[in-house]
């Protein structure tokens, strides 16, 4: 659901944190992603955009517009509409969509996709779109369960003669004693629960809970009374549970409609060898039928009416939406009007261009329907369009300063100014990409701070798109002069 691939070190803007080799192997160096510094839209209490807040710099009008859309989403008045972010490359369209998802919270599903993802040789384009639509719709299920919870003080399996095999024995039942702060209770459980206990590797001293209805067993951790037993142990110690052993517990589960589709489309097989081999051999990607989705929708509606579940519309972000064709746009029109639909955010960097899938064949080949942003007008009418503007020089400087802080680089003021000039002359993305190579060059020279010399050297080693185009043009002219065209 939503997406949080970065650790807390990078999100707080303190740079990558390298753990000592003596610490746990689970600790890893924090990965700095492209939008690690974005934590929200950076709006004040009255909805106006701050100059620089929550990792966002500039784009005040676009941020304020997204703030209004955010209020509409929270009030559930954005159904049947879509938000279109239109602007040049590197103007913060993806960052705006990510900021909206973070403002909504991690419990609201956020499903990003690119327009070219719909083209597959195995699945229809409309099926890929519907899958992503269902991924962006969450279902919060509240269920009251009867559970037995406590620390295991006794675990005794009772064996009995197996009438089907000669001298073999089988588990008849298992006796478990659970202890809490209030008291102890002894349980006599089914042998199938003993199999679950063996799979979880549960032993005396572990804190577990058993669901009374389903018989599911979950290991919570090791009792903290055993914390002094071993000096080196990768174990999670938990306190002794309070209250009675047998209690009622409210469990909240967050799933998406796509999870329900997959669970019903691919049910788990049996324990026989053919079922196991069938699960190992991955087949072709299959489509979920409309009939199955309709049945799931009916069950979901029933749960919502009974108050068991709550529908959580998430955000579907389609980047490079101009890559979709006419069939996909027609399908989007219908999907936006359906009763169960997420909030859709589209992004494109195209102006007037041809709608994909409308090219004519024959004498007029290469021509088709030209529309703003490469989107048909009937879908464009449903969109609230937000324009992103190119960054000014001061804003580029602030973004570079912020990224240097997040990535843990020390940079001199004159070097930052030189990098800002590169961002103005080429692009902000190219200037950001020069940060890490410049840092490595500075460390190679024995400096902890990036200087203007490192920026110049990195700029000579790596060229931007405009310089690359000029080099290719000059090479092309030289080749044309050196090798004349042959004439018959």
UniProtKB/Swiss-Prot annotation:
User: Tell me, what does this protein do in biology?
Assistant: DNA helicase which participates in several chromatin remodeling complexes, including the SWR1 and the INO80 complexes. The SWR1 complex mediates the ATP-dependent exchange of histone H2A for the H2A variant HZT1 leading to transcriptional regulation of selected genes by chromatin remodeling. The INO80 complex remodels chromatin by shifting nucleosomes and is involved in DNA repair. Also involved in pre-rRNA processing.
Primary localization class, coarse: nucleus
Q: How does it assemble?
A: May form heterododecamers with RVB2. Component of the SWR1 chromatin remodeling complex, the INO80 chromatin remodeling complex, and of the R2TP complex.
Q: Name one GO cellular component term.
A: Ino80 complex
Q: What ranges does the record give for the region Disordered, renumbered to this chain? A: 1-29
Provide the alphabetized UniProt keywords: Activator, ATP-binding, Chromatin regulator, DNA damage, DNA repair, Helicase, Hydrolase, Nucleotide-binding, Nucleus, Transcription, Transcription regulation
Q: What are the EC numbers?
A: 3.6.4.12
Q: Where does ATP bind?
A: 87-94
The record's similarity note reads: Belongs to the RuvB family.
- The stretch of residues making up the signal peptide is none
Q: Which GO terms describe its molecular function?
A: 3'-5' DNA helicase activity; 5'-3' DNA helicase activity; ATP binding; ATP hydrolysis activity; DNA helicase activity
Q: Which reaction does it catalyse?
A: ATP + H2O = ADP + phosphate + H(+)
A Pfam family hit:
TIP49
One GO process term, biological-process aspect:
DNA repair
Subcellular location(s) of the protein: Nucleus
Enumerate the InterPro entries for this protein. AAA+_ATPase, P-loop_NTPase, RuvB-like, RuvB-like_C, RuvBL1/2_DNA/RNA_bd_dom, TIP49_P-loop
What protein am I looking at? RuvB-like helicase 1
The species this protein belongs to is: Mycosarcoma maydis
**Compositionally skewed regions (Polar residues) per UniProt:** 1-11
């Amino acid at each position: 659901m939503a997406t949080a691939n970065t650790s807390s070190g990078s999100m707080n803007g303190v740079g990558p944190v390298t753990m000592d080799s003596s610490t746990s192997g689970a600790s890893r160096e924090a990965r700095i992603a492209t939008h690690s510094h974005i934590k929200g839209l950076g709006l004040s209490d009255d909805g106006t955009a701050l100059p620089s807040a929550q990792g966002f710099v500039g784009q005040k009008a676009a941020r304020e517009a997204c703030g209004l859309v955010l209020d509409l989403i929270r009030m559930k008045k954005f159904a049947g509409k879509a938000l279109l972010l239109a602007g040049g490359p590197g103007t913060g369209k993806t960052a705006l969509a990510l900021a909206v998802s973070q403002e909504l919270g991690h419990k609201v599903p956020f499903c990003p996709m690119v327009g070219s993802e719909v083209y597959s040789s195995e699945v229809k384009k409309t099926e890929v779109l519907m899958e992503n639509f269902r991924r962006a719709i969450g279902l919060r299920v509240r269920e009251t369960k009867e559970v037995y919870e406590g620390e295991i003080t006794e675990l005794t399996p009772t064996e009995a003669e197996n009438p089907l095999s000669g001298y073999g024995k089988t588990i008849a039942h298992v006796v478990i004693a659970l202890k809490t702060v209030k008291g102890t209770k002894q349980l006599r459980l089914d042998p199938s629960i003993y199999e679950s206990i063996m799979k979880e590797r549960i032993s005396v001293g572990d804190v577990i809970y058993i669901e009374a209805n389903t018989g599911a067993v979950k290991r919570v951790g090791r009792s903290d009374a055993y914390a002094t037993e071993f000096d080196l142990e990768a174990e999670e110690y938990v306190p002794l549970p309070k209250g009675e052993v047998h209690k009622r517990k409210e469990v909240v589960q967050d799933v998406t409609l796509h999870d329900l589709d997959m669970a019903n489309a691919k049910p788990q097989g049996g324990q026989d060898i053919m079922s196991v081999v069938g699960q190992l051999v991955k087949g072709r990607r299959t489509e979920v039928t409309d009939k199955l989705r309709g049945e799931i929708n009916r069950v979901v509606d029933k749960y919502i009416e009974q108050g068991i579940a709550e529908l959580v519309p998430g955000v579907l972000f389609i980047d490079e939406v101009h890559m979709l064709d006419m069939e996909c746009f027609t399908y989007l029109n219908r999907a936006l009007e359906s009763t169960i639909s997420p909030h859709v955010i589209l992004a494109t960097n195209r102006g007037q261009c041809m709608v994909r899938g409308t090219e004519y064949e024959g004498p007029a080949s290469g021509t088709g329907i030209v529309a703003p942003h490469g989107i048909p007008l009937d879908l464009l009418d449903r969109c609230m369009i937000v324009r992103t503007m190119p960054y000014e020089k001061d804003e580029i400087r602030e973004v570079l300063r912020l990224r240097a802080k997040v990535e843990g680089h020390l940079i001199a003021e004159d070097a930052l100014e030189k990098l800002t000039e590169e961002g103005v002359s080429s692009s902000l993305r190219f200037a950001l990409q020069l940060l890490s190579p410049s840092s490595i060059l500075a460390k190679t020279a024995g400096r902890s701070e990036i200087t203007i010399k490192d920026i110049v050297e990195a700029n000579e080693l790596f060229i931007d798109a405009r310089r690359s185009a000029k080099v290719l043009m000059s090479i092309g002219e030289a080749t044309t002069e050196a090798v004349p065209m042959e004439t018959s």
